[in-house]
Amino acid sequence: MTEELKKQGIADGAADAETVEETGATPDLDEAAKAAEREARRQALYEENERAEDERARAEAERMRDVDDEDEDETPRDTWATVRRLWSEAAGDHWRFYIVFASIVFYAIFNTAAPAYSARVIDELWGHIQVAFANDTTFNITWENCGRTIFIYFMIWTAAASFYALQSFLMSSVAERLNLLLRNRIAQKLNRLPLAFFDAHRPGEVVSRATNDLDKMSESMQRGLLQLLVSIGTVVGAVSVMFVFSVPLTLVFLFFTALSLLVTKVVSRRTHDVTGERQEWVSRITSAVEEGYSGRLVICAFNRERQSSAEVHQASGELARVSAKADFMINAVGPAVRFIGRLAQIVIAIVGCSMLVAGHMTVGVFQAFFQFIYEASEPMTQLSFTFNSLQSALASAERVFDLLDEPEMEADPQPGEAARLPGRVEGRVAFEHVRFGYAPDKPLMRDVSFTAEPGQKIAVVGTTGAGKTTLINLLMRFYEIDGGRITLDGVDTSRMDRGELRQQFGMVLQDAWLFDGTIAENIAYGCPEATREEIVAAARAAQVDFFVRTMPQGYDTRVANDAESISQGQRQLLTIARVLLNNPAILILDEATSSVDTRTELAIGRAMDALMRGRTSFVIAHRLSTIVDADLILVMDHGNIIEQGTHKELLAAEGAYADLYLSQFA
């Protein structure tokens, strides 16, 4: 097909040349001047195309860097604003929070009372043991002398454990309910976001908001927030009782605790810097290995294997050096903190023993004080790590709220107010002085007007970035226009319901997309109520039935977009079958045969002919040989239509279209 169209194009050019020669109106010098002018314009088009591609690549790289910087930021912009937002989102579970807070208070009370009461238990036991020793009698534990005290001690611990279990259960319930609420809101939000949002954000970035960020936030609420509140309550209660027991010992404990926190902060800050350096070397090694894999042919062709290996070897050596340093610092935090803790215990034991000998402290109080050391020091050590975890979770919550606060599409008219198409759709499309820009201060389309009559084939051509896809996006109302209007059979599309409007269109995209499911489900994607007979009929019309029957389970074979068993051409045939089954009034074909072999292209061509028969069709194509039979060709440049007409009319005009056409056959 391509060769025939090329020959046709060359023949058209030759016919035009013969016409000029017959008229004798143009001297040879004028012909040479025109040829030179066409060559200059052609070269300018190539250079402009290259500049547009470079500019797009630079903009994409800059946007990726901005997104990466944002993802690495684990500190919320406004902590309290995010906390208030989370509180308002969990409005239906406030009573659960109140019970959690009350449980934490009671847990802290009983958790503090247990070691304090143990002092009485030990003192009573020690007193009875001393009496028995003085009277030279056997000491037996009874309910009257110590049993009641031990039972009360056991019940205090039981109460503390019960309140801890209650708060853990309720906090998990609140976190999961909030997670479910926000996940559902994100799913609904994505359906209301304009196409501009998806153009400006990577798929992984959006998916991360609905998965990683929500999971991190939920996990931190269940563990981090609960641990923070419990730790604060435990530390406050323990230190308060420690001051009651002994002010000097408590001051010694607080001194060593402050020293421990200081060491942890200093080492953690230094570890953060070294870890960042390690991540840089990991990125370098990843890039070097990826280049060595993807550019293997070039490396071998230029005998650069040794240099490529040397780069990886050097980066690996630096990574090993930095990793050893980082691992040492990370592993040194725990022993350093434990050493300071043991030193504190030794000092407290020496001071406490002297007070015990002097009669300023009982044995029970002395052992209870050591219990409080553990009760207070462990939460204090965890507080810094818990705080960092919560900061990261709040940053995740902030990113989730940023997504939920994104501007939405303009709402559709109410069902009773929406404009309706008058009966059967004929497919007459008109752009009337349309103005549009992706940014308010940067208009792209200034005054675009054309009319597509029912059943016509409309081709849209132009260099990269000329506005071809933008025109189709406006037609489908993926974007809202800034001025003018677009009509379908005389009805303003901006006043129509988007669902009803898009139901009239069928799209065959350059990147044919298959969803996870069977082949039959993929063909019936837009028409789930279709019968198997209708699905098979659409597949036959799309020239894909024979291929489907060679699959293991035929139409019940499961496929996905990354399935390697289906070629690009076969994917496009399946999407053509999908469109045929929907039976739309208007077609949009986006370079549907740009990357297939000749045989598949012929099959797609026959399927396209069946698809376009009797329908208004918009074809976006870079290979102009495929649209020489179009009823109307729109030549776009920088968002505007600079030429329109048939193939012969535009060739005769010797303008931008002629330059594009001749450049493909020169």
Task: Please describe what each predicted stretch is.
Residues 88-92, 195-196, 212-221, 225, ...:
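An intracellular "coupling" helix at the cytosolic face of ABC transporter transmembrane type-1 domains
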Residues 2-22, 139, 413-666:
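ABC-type nucleotide-binding domain
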Residues 3-5, 9-13, 22-84, 172-215, ...:
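Extended non-transmembrane interhelical loops and adjacent amphipathic helices
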Residues 105-113, 157-165, 217-220, 224-236, ...:
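Hydrophobic alpha-helical transmembrane bundles that constitute the permease/transmembrane domains
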Residues 92, 96-109, 223-277, 348-361, ...:
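Transmembrane helices of ABC transporter permease
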Residues 72, 76, 102-103, 110-126, ...:
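Juxtamembrane helix-loop junctions of ABC transporter transmembrane domains
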Residues 241-255, 325-398, 403-404:
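Helix-loop-helix
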Residues 97-163, 243-248, 346, 359-363:
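Transmembrane helix-loop-helix hairpins at lipid-water interfaces of multipass membrane proteins
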